[in-house]
């Protein structure tokens, strides 16, 4: 049995270590008090800066150790998509339309072919998300970096009065999940350390090599979510990233009662190799990359809209059991 913490990613330890940085960051808010760009609070998927009639939303994220898989097989043309996806999907969670992005690419040494492949993925991701890449930083640091690191910072815009934070979520609301493309960009450290030493990257599983499962690009949800929020009342939006279903606790203190889709593909292989079910749902997206919460009366229209883009599921409902996320069909409470 291997857990995420045993693989080297202890999220509780990280949260404790971050407390001082978050406290200090909040102290800087007073520097913009009463000025254009005054920030809201820290903690949601994206920060909100006050620009009068609208908020500028801002977020930052990276691809993580998925880059190590790309490096191992010499295939870098999809990690740019991952970086765009990780950022724009977070912007969507406050109801913002993504506008632009800057990238940060740290390397041991410049390689023209690698740069060309990364650029290809960045363009494809930007095209899907409808954003402009307006700048960036390439850092060549042979004494610090042993391979590659790719991250970015994105901005979006949302009108005041249209911000979605989860505060309107109520017991009885419907919970809808949009399918993921696979592992996305979270839990790769656990997946790599569990599977690669045992099988190797060329291992065939259900018709695909292991590296193909691991490098499948993160799905970009901009089109379905923007269509949704312009069509129905939406109470909450959650990008299911690191922490799995625990991300729902970022939206509300209310509980959730869900039935998740069957465990398939890469998640099935990981579970079969000893990762317990509760850990699976705490680490991976488990086939659902994005979750929306809508009033019951909006459920059918929401499902119709989302299903036009990607396979979507009616997962369950919001409950009055504070802080409890129940996955009924697997007998798990998170």
Swiss-Prot record:
Pathway: Purine metabolism; IMP biosynthesis via de novo pathway; 5-amino-1-(5-phospho-D-ribosyl)imidazole from N(2)-formyl-N(1)-(5-phospho-D-ribosyl)glycinamide: step 2/2. The keyword Signal does not apply. It is found in: Cytoplasm. The keyword Cytoplasm applies. It comes from the Archaea. Pfam families: AIRS, AIRS_C. Belongs to the AIR synthase family. This is Phosphoribosylformylglycinamidine cyclo-ligase. The gene is purM.
